Amino acid sequence: MFHSVQEYVSKCETCQRTKSTTLKPTGLLQPLPIPCQVWDDITLDFIEGLPCSQGKNTILVVVDRLSKSAHFMSLSHPFSAKTVAEKFINGVVKLHGMPKSIISDRDPIFISKFWQEFFKMSGTQLKMSSAYHPQTDCQTEVINRCLEQYLRCFVHQWPRKWHEYLP
């Protein structure tokens, strides 16, 4: 069965256009400690540069490090730290409570004074990934890649309708 699936995928035109190849990461990886509880430790990232769909062109990706469960929220560029915080509260905190720690890249939103104070007041620890080392937050990068491939497969003919297919 494995060979049948492999052969089918190798001949699928949509798969060939939208799927990316994966490579083994270079160097020694130092994994982050495993969280103890679901939605206590999360990661945040943006997928930017999307075509405008219903006025939105960015996706905020929030991933739970333990369960690998994710939330995707669309945003309009330009957005502020306050707008992102409101989306985060309405889309994640209301459902799962406030996390104990957040890992994110060094996006200007995540290093803004507002964002720092917001999480300081809530008792959430902010952790930044190393500059130019996305493998620190590899799990979110994998989720981003999967979401991008999913959207490409469904909207390759109508790229301005990605918002309708956002899970």
Residue ranges with predicted function:
Residues 1-167:
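Integrase module of LTR retroelements
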